[in-house]
Amino acid sequence: MAKQKTLSKTKSTTPTNQVDGVIESIGPQGQLITSIENGILVDAGQDESVSVMFGAHMTVGVYPEDHGQPDATLVASMGQSGFLEIEIVGVSISEMLGIKAGGPVSVTW
């Protein structure tokens, strides 16, 4: 289960929340299924103030499962699994980037 950390706010542009987790498994379409529960992320937005870091990679925003993003877009979403999922729409992110279960994931907003 993911741990939530609250960071002190020093500027209005500084993130105030961080949740750390791991990639728990790889889904049937090659998406990364994390240990971060969707419920923890309800206050995180879909804009550039939210960053999702996983290994050496990053995307912005946490979108609903039915995000409607076009093919080849890197997206973090509240997955059907009940946990944060990271995908490249229409492509196996696990195969394309060589990412395996066990790697770190961090969401800040």
Each language-model region and where it sits:
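Charge-biased, low-complexity intrinsically disordered regions
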Residues: 1-109
